[in-house]
Amino acid sequence: MPVSPAIPELHARIVAALTQARHDAKLRQVDLAKRLGWQQAYVSRYETGERMLAVDEYVAVTRALGVDPVALLAQVLDGEDGGVD
């Protein structure tokens, strides 16, 4: 789903990278939510741009995905395509 135009571009790129990382990990939203102790709707809301993630939530999501939070953010800031190696 496209990210809402109401959220800033940087946040949209971060969300795209997180969503791609989830897909790369072959996890459904419900699987990620379970790892985090969240409801699936919460994952959906941040992935669609309905809700912004706080920094601590971003770190929790990256760790649940097995992705380094600093490396992912560096890729986004460096203008990478949002994918995770």
Please describe what each predicted stretch is.
Residues 1-24:
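A short, Lys/Arg-rich alpha-helix, primarily the initiator
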Residues 2, 63, 71-85:
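Short, charged recognition helix plus adjacent turn
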Residues 50-63:
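Short, basic-rich loop-to-helix N-cap that marks the start of a DNA-contacting helix
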